[in-house]
UniProtKB/Swiss-Prot annotation:
Residues 1-71, 130-166, 291-296 are lumenal. InterPro entries: JAMP. It is found in: Endoplasmic reticulum membrane. This is JNK1/MAPK8-associated membrane protein homolog. It holds the Pfam family JAMP. The gene is jamp-1. The chain crosses the membrane at residues 72-92, 109-129, 167-187, 209-229, 230-250, 270-290, 297-317. The lineage of its organism: Eukaryota, Metazoa, Ecdysozoa, Nematoda, Chromadorea.
Amino acid sequence: MSSLSGHASTIQPSCLGFCGRTVLVGNYSEDVEATTTAAGSTSLSRCGPCSFGYRNNAMSICESCDTPLQPYDWMYLLFIALLPLLLHMQFIRIARKYCRTRYYEVSEYLCVILENVIACVIAVLIYPPRFTFFLNGCSKTDIKEWYPACYNPRIGYTKTMRCTYEVVFPLYSITFIHHLILIGSILVLRSTLYCVLLYKTYNGKPFYAAIVSVPILAVIHAVLSGVVFYTFPYILLIGSLWAMCFHLALEGKRPLKEMIVRIATSPTHLIFLSITMLMLSFGVIAIIAPLDIPYRWSFLCIVPVPFIFYMATIPFSNPTTTMRLS
């Protein structure tokens, strides 16, 4: 491939936009634009979209996306997987007043976790290298690579060359596969749970909300995936801080000692605060992981600071004001 790239670069100009040339083996007289290589049997096609799982390189040749995903890419996929999980859990929490016993509520929580785990596992297994828990992908350098349809080159200001394909393979398409499998899992597992265990004992609003929310998340991904890819750590930070403050504000203004006792003796408080702390840690790790600075992991020490600050400033604040604004 390297010899082919060097040879092609000396006789052909680079393709425009995200277009690339595909390596052809054999006689393709109608599609071949370059001369044959020294081997005499390999040629390059005209400029056009690369195949699924390929992207253009610096020489405008379509190369296979066989580079292992970077840690930041995996954290983005984890963020995408956590969104429906946390959202569906929130739907169950809102419908708690319709639940007769905690047993039914816990059973639906477990069902939601199982649905998302199944969707994540299947989505990862069907992408190359297939049937492994590893993913290969293309290198990414710019937000424009998430929107190739907006950068199709125009020839003579009249003709548009269509070079739309998944430049950021597999981060764009795997999300749609995950959401599609998730809808199937919800329809099968949640329906089975309702028919077998929760028949006439539980409200179906979390089920319908989950079914509607997944397509909405898919539409948001289709439009804002590039923006979310570069900003999701900050979304996590802001979202987890807001959730923590809002949850603690529900307790109102209490003495510090009483507030600590209520939090320490309430499983709901402990679980919710643990989740927000994990999300806050996740956001901090996603920010510092790509940085090449000494002692970067020491920034994790700031994770408990917002909680400590809130508890220390309760005597000087009025949480009920937050509730009225919400």
